[in-house]
Swiss-Prot record:
Membrane topology: Peripheral membrane protein
Major localisation: membrane
Main EC class the enzyme belongs to: translocase
Family according to the record: Belongs to the SecA family.
Keywords noted in UniProt: ATP-binding, Cell membrane, Cytoplasm, Membrane, Metal-binding, Nucleotide-binding, Protein transport, Translocase, Translocation, Transport, Zinc
SUPFAM superfamilies listed in its UniProt record: Helical scaffold and wing domains of SecA, P-loop containing nucleoside triphosphate hydrolases, Pre-protein crosslinking domain of SecA
Annotated binding of Zn(2+), by residue: 823, 825, 834-835
Essential cofactor(s): Zn(2+)
Protein name: Protein translocase subunit SecA
Length: 838
């Protein structure tokens, strides 16, 4: 172990020596750049662009380009990047993560690699965690980029598609991570190429990279549409039932936060819902409602996991930032279960049209880098998942903050009493205090305690984060006391007021340890910026969430052995600090394993998504007649159906093929059984294909010109693909839940998921081709007048696709349809899985 650590330290030292040499080369250009006039310095941008076009690489331009940005920053912003900031910039350009402490000027550091990479003309995305930081950084740093001749765009959720397109077309685009993800998904749902807003993803520089790529890695971005729902009553019934249970009726596993009914709970459920067997296959849907109601009532906690807004809506609280996540909803019916629990209106369920996780979104960029003050603890995950190294950058000035050892108390009451005393003492002498909590509930509780003690203070949590920046900016003033949920206000520096340095600087107090050491380090890092004095102190209790879940029994036994009173039994020991850190490492390990497993599942979806989106993009951007592609789909659909019936008895086979042809390919009266008799399978395929092409040509002839034909083909294919893809996403979600249960039968759930989803994907492709064929042949196309606007082309083309619904024709004899044949209704499913099931 010691050898491994030594190797890591030596590698870091070697990397830093290399970075120092490169930074010195940039600094060597300082006098040369300082001698240039403003116009000459600005002209460097066009010169660099030309040199890049002529074959020089960005690496070749690095030293001069960085020197130009340094000089530009001095003239425009009055800031001159330090050598350590140049080193950080080089790491960012190489597609890695420089670990830079709070207050070391990460925003200014980013200007150098952003400028350099923007010279290529392919777009640079600077990604932040919220829109306040997006606008702030784009406004402050945009002044420098504009002065140097680069365009800067700001991408906000409220902007129109035209404004977003303009923002993405700029050399540099500032945006939140979620907005880039949603724009990507929406771009892959449009019908016309000109409605897309993004360019291909080139280079992303992610601020607070650990928050986005680690903490939110599992969060799927979902674009969904409402599904008509008659299940609201079931949510309320399940909620009423669950609220009637006693503690003995359900079992909670605290470490994994899972819950289920005990035997007595199952008996009560069967009695309540008048069932013989709750776990009969017919009651699967009901057990899902009960499970969600259990989670909502006994796992999800008001003001910790979610809050109820003034508009009577359930808003999710981000566990890492303490902010409410506007527009986000728990999936799979859990959000509705919480709505029923809290007595607010239950909203309809939605169906996912498109989704992607941040892990897969950011892995699509050609180059990815990011900045944070705390990434070293997650180095393995950055390397394994994103192929990114973490390189610690030294501080410009030595850190002067004093980090006190943790204080451990037996109860929450004694802990908070000590916190209030400490805050009061520091407040009286004028030292500013920032108190970090892990939940909204704790903030409110502590706030009441401080009010009772007569200590004026500000509270920053999920309920008022719109005042976030203002509160944080004042947190370093003399006598200021600020309570902040977790890492709310991250990205905004706390500057010390007059006379505060002499009082010891900002004191950060943590009221409990977070699951992740990194989050604790972020809280500590709010104090002692750029060599300022400061202090940090964590107060813990045996009743804290982390201590309850992981190993507080041994510590409690020690306290009991000494028989200390509440006031006396405060422990300050390195041994206990190490135990707490060991518990944190265990949780971090569990979370990493979970994220790795999620990625294994999500990679399957990623591969399939990329195929569908690539095909979709090809259709949207095609400036040609798509007849060859549609002809191929028609041929494959015919071949599949005939091959699928090849082993059936001759009479049964021909009947099935005739029904298929009549109701999916050609006019009913144009074909009869005698046309198929005496032909081999290959001859039947050829005959049907020939007839289908005649129908295709007659359909196309009804359209007024080549432009209308192309529009019709595109809308037809895209409409089918989008509907089938939406259904496929839903099916994959259900499959994922199902294979999780197969793990109990000694099968590897990931392998099962991969093989099953591959089969489902192939079925979906067949189903897409079947529907395109059926719609093409059976669409009622009317002679069109020339539309007045381009928009009308899409609506007219869409309106023309009005084929019959997938209902069975009245004269179909179900007895003659084989179980494994395609259902004659045209759904694309096998008969046994469609009308044969009824």
């Amino acid at each position: 172990m010691a050898n491994i650590l030594r190797t890591i330290i030596e590698n870091d030292k070697g990397e830093l020596r290399k970075l120092e040499k490169m930074a010195n080369k940039v600094i060597a250009y300082s006098d040369q750049m300082a001698a240039l006039s403003d116009e000459e310095l600005k002209a460097k941008t066009d010169e660099f662009k030309q040199r890049y076009q002529n074959g020089e690489s960005l690496d070749d331009l690095l030293y001069e380009a960085f020197a130009v940005v340094r000089e530009g920053a001095k003239r425009v912003l009055g800031l001159y990047p330090y050598p350590v900031q140049i080193m950080g910039g080089i790491v960012l350009h190489h597609g890695d993560v420089p670990e830079m402490r709070t207050g070391e000027g990460k925003t200014l550091t980013a200007t150098m690699p952003v400028y350099l990479n923007a010279l290529a003309g392919e777009g640079v995305h600077v990604v932040t965690v919220n829109e306040y930081l997006t606008e702030r950084d784009a406004t402050e740093m945009g002044e420098l980029y504009s002065w140097l001749g680069l365009s800067v765009g700001i991408n906000l959720a409220a902007k129109s598609p035209a404004e977003k397109r303009e923002a993405y077309a700029c050399d540099i685009t500032y945006s939140t991570n979620s907005e880039i993800g949603f724009d990507y998904l929406r771009d892959n749902m449009v019908v016309r190429a000109e409605n897309m807003v993004q360019r291909p993803l080139n280079y992303a520089l992610v601020d607070e990279v650990d928050s986005i790529l680690i903490d939110e890695a599992r969060t799927p971005l979902i674009v969904s549409g409402p599904v008509s729902s008659e299940t609201n009553q079931l949510y309320h019934m399940a909620d009423s039932f669950v609220k009637s249970l006693n503690k003995d009726d359900y079992i909670i596993d605290v470490p994994s936060k899972t819950i289920g009914l005990s035997d007595s709970g199952i008996d009560k459920a069967e009695s309540y819902f008048k069932l013989d067997n709750l776990y009969d296959i017919e009651n699967v849907a009901l057990t899902h409602f009960i499970d969600n109601a259990l989670r909502a009532n006994y796992i999800m906690i008001l003001d910790i996991d979610y809050v109820v807004s003034e508009e009577q809506e359930i808003l999710i609280v981000d566990q890492f930032t303490g902010r409410t996540m506007e527009g986000r909803r728990y999936s799979d019916g859990l959000h509705q279960a919480i709505e029923a629990k809290e007595g607010v209106p239950v909203q309809d369920e939605t169906k996912t049209s498109a989704s992607i996780t941040y892990q897969n979104l950011f892995r699509m960029y050609k180059k990815l880098s990011g900045m944070t003050g705390t990434a070293k603890t997650e180095e393995e995950e950055f390397r394994e998942t994103y192929n990114i190294r973490v390189i610690p950058i030294p501080t410009n000035r030595p850190i002067a903050r004093i980090d006190h050892e943790d204080l451990l108390y037996p109860s929450l009451e004694s802990k908070f009493k000590a916190v209030v005393e400490d805050v009061k003492e520091r407040h009286l002498k004028g030292q500013p205090v920032l108190v970090g909590t892990v939940a909204v509930e704790t903030s409110d509780y502590l706030s009441k305690k401080l009010v009772a003690a007569g200590i004026p203070h500000e509270v920053l949590n999920a309920k008022n984060h719109y005042r976030e920046a203002q509160i944080i900016m004042n947190a370093g003033q003399r006598g200021a006391v600020t309570i902040a949920t977790n890492m709310a206000g991250r990205g905004t520096d706390i500057k010390l007021g007059e006379g505060v340095r002499e009082l010891g600087g900002l004191c950060v107090i943590g009221t409990e340890r977070h699951e992740s050491r990194r989050i604790d380090n972020q809280l500590r890092g709010r104090s002692g910026r750029q060599g300022d004095p400061g202090e940090s102190q964590f107060y813990l209790s045996l009743e804290d969430e982390l201590m309850r879940r992981f190993g507080s029994e041994r510590i409690k036994a020690v306290l009991d052995r000494f028989k200390l009173s509440e006031e006396e039994s405060v422990i300050k020991s390195k041994m206990f600090t190490r135990q707490v850190e060991a518990a944190q490492k265990r949780v971090e390990g569990n979370n990493y394993d979970t994220r790795k497993q999620v990625l294994q599942y999500d990679d399957v979806m990623r591969e399939q998504r990329e195929i569908i989106y690539a095909e979709r993009h090809d259709v949207i951007t095609a400036n040609r007649d798509l007849a060859p592609e549609i002809h191929a789909m028609i041929k494959r659909t015919i071949d599949r159906f005939v091959d699928g019936n090849s082993r059936a008895p001759q009479e049964e086979k021909l009947d099935s093929i005739l029904y298929f042809a009549k109701y999916n390919l050609v006019p009913e009266e144009s074909i009869s059984l005698s046309d198929l008799q005496g032909l081999s399978d290959e001859e039947i395929k050829a005959s049907l294909y020939e007839r289908a092409l005649e129908v295709y040509n007659s359909q196309i002839a009804k359209l007024r010109d080549e432009e209308a034909v192309r529009e019709f083909q595109k809308v037809l294919i895209l409409r089918v693909v989008d509907n089938k893809w939406t259904d496929h996403i839903d099916a994959l979600d259900q499959l994922r839940n199902a294979v999780g249960l197969r793990g109990y039968a000694q099968n590897n759930p990931v392998v099962e998921y991969q093989s099953e989803s591959f089969r489902m994907f192939n079925d979906m492709i067949g189903s897409i081709e079947f529907d395109v064929t059926r719609l093409m042949m059976k669409a009622q196309i009317h002679e069109q007048e020339r539309p007045r606007t381009e928009h009308n082309i899409v609506t007219t083309a869409t309106r023309n696709i009005s084929a019959q619904e997938s209902d069975l024709p009245a004269d179909v004899d179900l007895a003659k349809v084989g179980r494994n044949e395609l259902c004659p209704c045209g759904s694309g499913k096998k008969f046994k899985n469609c009308h044969g099931r009824r």
